[in-house]
């Protein structure tokens, strides 16, 4: 049986955790558990350009493979169809992967896929993320996970770990916990930017997913924000969008020191999302 690691000092300090969420996400179809947070919640902050972020979690998810690459249970959200009217338009968003699970035995994971709305065919796996005791969390590692097609910033993201690194209310009872100890891969990535140039005009839809692997204990989730095509938000869109404008993506510098990484990513992700 897995043993939970609690840090009671951290949990006691954070006993009042912001949890302003709504049921599911407007303009998206949910299987499992999703919501919207309108204030900083534990380790997941609200980027300064936004008033809220979307999230999905394996806590409250459905049993079985939810359309990813295997798993015991999980959740997905799928956007309404959106139009791409210019070849090469940039699909952009940012995400923050949070997991209380760890070790390579229980590689909980997250992903985002882009589909062609005309025939439901997979166009691209934009990113994957997995629990990983050492090395990269994004892109994800493990059997069955495909190569990613989006450009992510930073190009390899590991988790911030340690006491308090999994405090996030969408994880339910797993918030603030970690499987075995904090050397096994639990934690959060902070905000990671993703950009993918859609090669052909047409109608598309986007799916985000999270899944438990190996068991249904120690939940995992993901926040995401800023989904846009050519700088035009795709959320709440179920008709053709206007001709996209050129999106300005600001360069994001990688931190030289691990202690500076979070503040640099936080500052620069706002530039990444700014249209």
Show where each model-derived region lies.
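Bacterial N-terminal signal peptides that target proteins for export
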Residues: 2-9
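Conserved short hydrophobic patches within well-ordered secondary structure
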Residues: 9, 52-54, 249-255, 275
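Bacterial N-terminal signal peptides
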Residues: 9-17
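Sec/Tat signal peptide C-region and signal peptidase I cleavage site
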Residues: 17-23
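Aromatic (Trp/Tyr/Phe) and Gly/Pro-enriched flexible surface segments
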Residues: 24-238
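A short, hydrophobic C-terminal helix/tail in secreted or cell-surface proteins
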Residues: 242-260
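C-terminal membrane-anchoring or membrane-association module
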Residues: 257-275
